[in-house]
Design a protein with these regions (language model features):
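Glycine-rich hexapeptide-repeat left-handed beta-helix
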Residues: 1-156
Length: 161
């Protein structure tokens, strides 16, 4: 399922997955939807591991996510709101995270204002005006997910490679 205003124009496999709104899937981004063991997919929800009892589940990509060229997302992984992902995604990614662990060994917090500016730019490309409600929603999600970023070890410093 690919929601409105999302872009998957390039090569790459995207199977048995959910993609939120305003997502850009970079060229060559692919996901796995089947474990090498052919076993059922287990996902983490909160602090609880849940057996889905399904052997085919792709990824779950939240609104405003951007994937860089050549991302590989492992089976059943969740990508949080406004995250930017790079390289191999082997674990769930919190909202507002620049995930570059396979490249730098680290993840960085995406500044809220940067997320809002990116939202504005992508909406303008579709002749849609960003509203105060759009910005307020991102602000609220940013605040609601700050503990998740802390627990994940996301660095509150500028991203660099």
């Amino acid at each position: 399922i690919i929601s409105s205003h999302s872009n998957k124009a390039h090569d790459g496999f995207l199977g048995h997955s959910y993609v939120g709104e305003w997502v850009n899937i970079g060229a060559g981004t692919s996901n796995s939807d089947l474990k090498n063991t052919y076993g059922t997919v287990k996902m983490t929800l909160g602090n609880i591991e849940v057996d889905t009892k399904l052997n085919k589940i792709g990824c779950f990509i939240s609104d405003h996510v951007k994937t860089s060229i050549g991302c590989f997302i492992y089976t059943g992984k969740r990508i949080g709101v406004s995250s930017h992902i790079h390289g191999y995604i082997t674990e769930d990614v919190p909202s507002f995270t620049i995930y570059a662990k396979s490249l730098t060994g680290k993840s960085f917090e995406l500044h809220k204002n940067s997320a809002m500016e990116t939202q504005k730019r992508i909406m303008e490309r579709r002749n849609i005006t960003q509203t105060s409600n759009d910005k307020d929603l991102l602000s609220r999600i940013f605040k609601m997910t700050q503990d998740e970023r802390y627990m994940f070890g996301v660095l509150k410093t500028d991203f660099s490679m």
